[in-house]
Amino acid sequence: MAKADEGTDYIRVTLARLVPEHGQGRVVILKTYKDPKSYYMDGATLVFNRPLGIRRNKVVLPAGYELVGCTVASQVLMEKDGRIAISFMHAGAGEAPLILRAVKDAQVGAAALPHAATRDKSWESPFAGETERARLTERAYEDRDIVYFLQQPETHSFSLYHDYTERRAGVNGYANVVRDGSVASHPSAYVLDTGAQLKATEMSGAEMAASKINTGETVDPKARVVVIPFTAVKEGETLRLRIAETYTAPISYKLDGDELVFDRTLGRPRNAVVLPSGWYVTASAEPATVSLLPDGRVRLEYWDDRPEAADVLLKAKRRVEK
């Protein structure tokens, strides 16, 4: 082969027919690699550490393994036989720096099989079209961080904290509208800069308007909203807040047979979802990076660089008890 590296082995394929002018020759290549440097066990953890130069990739884990680490944002999918797979498109230059980690405590056999996908649409209506100004806002500059901590699915509840920077002079409150189908409880807030605790109160949109608290936005009078007042922001200053709440949302977070289902649009660029203890991810419609927390829970990071909301559909199964 011209320009070939003499120290490298190649597979040479003879095509069944000549490639026509302006045409293509399609080839399916099936091969098995053995490479201890890129695919190995690190204690009880399976590691696949292999940069991938192909633009579209899918990696299927062995039966019985759950995904606990993935460095490239990927869809998490389930094969028909219950094996976990990741799939991603790599649009950047060079190779995708993929490192997968997995541990052997996933279900096997009939218990591992996925539920059949339905024709049901998302319970949430699509978001209204964004304005040109919103679409051209620099999303990498947005510094909101939201972490969802899923409780056991039988409760339909999840807690979250939301870090937010207020920069608008004259604003003296934050409003968090409670979505239809959700109930908010245990709201709290404090100033990250000073540690000062803030009062959080749930009220209607009409009550918020009557309170004269300036949150910088208008809320439907009938909506339920958690309002957090604070000292008005002065010109040239900012205020960094951490807001925490617990939501109960039977429509978006539930147990479907033996599967956990979290179905919720996330509108901010940076979101994370932490599975409850004892569960492993089996499906994630939105690409996510995956990591394992010190306490054994799985965390999925959704960094959404697109102007529309991330339509997260996340599924999980219980780990095998050891």
Task: Briefly describe each language-model feature range.
Residues M1-K322:
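Lumenal/extracellular ectodomains and adaptor appendage modules
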